[in-house]
């Protein structure tokens, strides 16, 4: 299991069978704008927020550097993949595109999807040979809100998490206290769960409450939500939209 250890500016590898944690990338120092990468354990990185594994490559949402980075696990190299490092909403080639604190990341086929939180948008990155970035939905750095719709008409507010299930992308619309769903083909976004008011109420999708939901994970039956300010894991049924809170058993 790989972990984005945000405030330590590291990516960690947890070997569950051996109960062992090792560093996969980063030297413990916060990277600065213009970092070019290099040997994984010698390269400073900055606030890795989320990651996704593709064979022996990790794609990392490097929030602190406004870029997407790659970690080659076999060659033990870490380097920028997409984003100029300048905070912006700018589509185009992976070298020219601009991100603003990319946070959530997921992979479907040969496309990365990114919750670009400070820009309040969702991006798609076509992997090689295309190597380009485009915006699917949302506003810009100062164009945020809570509005369903299509493409640039959509308004999100600091989305931090994203997860894919079939032809749907689920979005943790963090500051709107909602879960949204996006169809990448049509670029349509609509509310999926959450009333929009911060709270912890379980129940039907439109009445349930979240409080700054962050990370997402999805199975064939349910969406699991790291409900950050409620210090809880919530479960949303993909068929009914019903929301409940997971009771976690503890052992010593």
Predicted regions and their residues:
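A short loop-to-beta-strand structural motif that recurs across blades of beta-propeller domains
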Residues: 9-13, 20, 66-69, 120-124, ...
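Blade-level signature of beta-propeller repeat domains, shared across WD40, Kelch, NHL, RCC1
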Residues: 217, 224-252
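Short coil/turn segments that connect the beta-strands within blades of beta-propeller domains
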Residues: 55-56, 109-110, 166-167, 220-221
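Conserved beta-strand positions in repeat-built beta-propeller and related beta-rich domains
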Residues: 3-7, 60-64, 114-118, 171-175, ...
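Gly/Pro-rich loop segments of beta-rich domains
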Residues: 18-47, 77-103, 130-160, 188-212, ...
């Amino acid at each position: 299991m790989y972990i984005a250890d945000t405030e330590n500016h590291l990516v960690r590898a947890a070997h569950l069978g051996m109960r062992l944690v090792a560093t996969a990338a980063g030297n413990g120092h916060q990277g600065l704008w213009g970092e070019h990468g290099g040997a994984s354990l010698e390269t400073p990185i900055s606030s890795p927020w989320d990651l996704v594994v593709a064979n022996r490559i990790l794609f990392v949402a490097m929030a602190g550097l406004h870029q997407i980075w790659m970690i080659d696990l076999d060659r033990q190299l870490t380097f920028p993949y997409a984003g100029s490092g300048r905070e912006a909403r700018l589509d185009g080639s992976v070298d020219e595109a601009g991100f603003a604190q990319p946070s959530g990341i997921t992979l479907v086929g040969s496309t990365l999807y990114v919750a670009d939180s400070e820009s309040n948008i969702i991006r798609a990155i076509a992997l090689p040979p295309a190597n380009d970035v485009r915006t699917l939905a949302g506003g810009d750095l100062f164009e945020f809100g809570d509005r369903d719709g299509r493409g640039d008409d959509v308004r999100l507010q600091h989305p931090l998490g994203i997860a894919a299930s079939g032809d749907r992308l689920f979005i943790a619309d963090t500051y709107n206290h909602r879960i949204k769903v996006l169809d990448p083909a049509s670029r349509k976004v609509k509310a999926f769960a959450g009333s929009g008011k911060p709270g912890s109420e379980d129940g039907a999708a439109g009445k349930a409450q979240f409080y700054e939901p962050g990370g997402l994970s999805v199975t064939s039956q349910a969406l699991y939500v790291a409900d950050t300010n409620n210090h809880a894991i919530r479960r949303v049924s993909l068929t009914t939209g019903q929301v409940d809170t997971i009771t976690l058993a503890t052992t010593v």
